[in-house]
């Protein structure tokens, strides 16, 4: 006999927390995990956290049969083969019209393949991005479901209550679009997250290495920044990090953390997609490259011995001015990073015919997710003003903000260069802006070179058509 409204398979911390969130919102939920101890652990947590209606099952048949028809099962398992294995386990007991939702960070084409395979079996399928980490899953994530619209309608009432709630814009969930669009949008969200984190780390590096700010001063600076236009989850937690003392030694914990950044692959996927779509995303690419370089810890230690010396300019620094300049540089760079992410999504939407609403994406990212920020409200309004906006940089408000901040931005990048401090994200953002704002680039020389050695032809600025010049013959004749 059916006892629950929905099921969830995969009870690592994210799965457990999402199940408890669903139950807490008034929806009885069945839970299943291949390792049965996780089932018992989740049920016990439900009791401790308020006798929540969570029902555990140790075998897939009982689990599926406990859910009311048409059945909806969310999977939260590792991307790739584990997803296919879980689908096979569940599908053996599901009936026509039932629905499977993959809530993991899956490659969008895998979602489209699975949706097609499930459709052939009479099952519905959704790929749903879930952002917010463990805390978000428990208390309200940002949700990005894409795939079968019929499947979305099955679960819309649950998602609207489970998602993060933002007072001025509602639940942080919307139907993203067809196919693998939900997973694709979550992937790019993560790429933007890479950019955000890199830019913040560069702001920290300049303030510490050039401005000589202490951790206590950095905590105060980031706390103050979190009251203005940079107000965001990542700025907030950065301020928190600078306040934490090392409980296993002296000083602050942040200074004891190894400078080697991990990653799970979504940032790399984003950069690969940008390349496939011919979309410039240098800030996001720089953030990925920085993670690769951070992984070369042993090589960097040896290189530091080879390139010994003081690269600082030894010029006096006005600390207050530096803090303000870095704040402005961070904000301007952030605009460029988000512009690149949105352009990747727009290009993919056009290629796949998804008709994605970029303003709506900004809205559902305002709460619950890792990149949640007051800044996203500005992005939503920009796309509300012009849904066909070519680039966030040319929105009138953002354009004015960048113009107002570019002097500080340039000062920070130059100061970093002169002091041997790398700012790949800020530098890439500035180069992106400078390239995008110019009506003529030195690409004419590159195209001339291509025509010289490869007869790739070129276009002219003064007449239509495609042209080829015998550059070598002309140059050789001129030298004779």
Swiss-Prot record:
Q: Where does NADP(+) bind?
A: 10-15, 33-35, 77-79, 105
Q: Which residues bind substrate?
A: 105, 131-133, 189-190, 194, 264, 291, 450, 456
- Residues of the active site are 186 (proton acceptor), 193 (proton donor)
Q: Which UniProt keywords apply?
A: Cytoplasm, Gluconate utilization, NADP, Oxidoreductase, Pentose shunt
Induction (UniProt) = By drought, cold, high salinity and abscisic acid (ABA) treatments.
Q: Does the keyword RNA-binding apply?
A: no
Q: Tell me which InterPro entries the record gives.
A: 6-PGluconate_DH-like_C_sf, 6PGD_dom2, 6PGDH_C, 6PGDH_Gnd/GntZ, 6PGDH_NADP-bd, NAD(P)-bd_dom_sf, Pgluconate_DH
Which Gene3D superfamilies does this chain map to? 6-Phosphogluconate Dehydrogenase, domain 3, N-(1-d-carboxylethyl)-l-norvaline Dehydrogenase, domain 2, NAD(P)-binding Rossmann-like Domain
Q: Which reaction does it catalyse?
A: 6-phospho-D-gluconate + NADP(+) = D-ribulose 5-phosphate + CO2 + NADPH
GO MF entry, a single one: phosphogluconate dehydrogenase (decarboxylating) activity
**Keyword NADP among record annotations:** yes
* Functional description taken from the UniProt entry: Catalyzes the oxidative decarboxylation of 6-phosphogluconate to ribulose 5-phosphate and CO(2), with concomitant reduction of NADP to NADPH.
Q: Which family does it belong to?
A: Belongs to the 6-phosphogluconate dehydrogenase family.
What is the name listed in the Swiss-Prot or TrEMBL entry for this protein? Answer: 6-phosphogluconate dehydrogenase, decarboxylating 1
User: Which species expresses this protein natively?
Assistant: Oryza sativa subsp. japonica
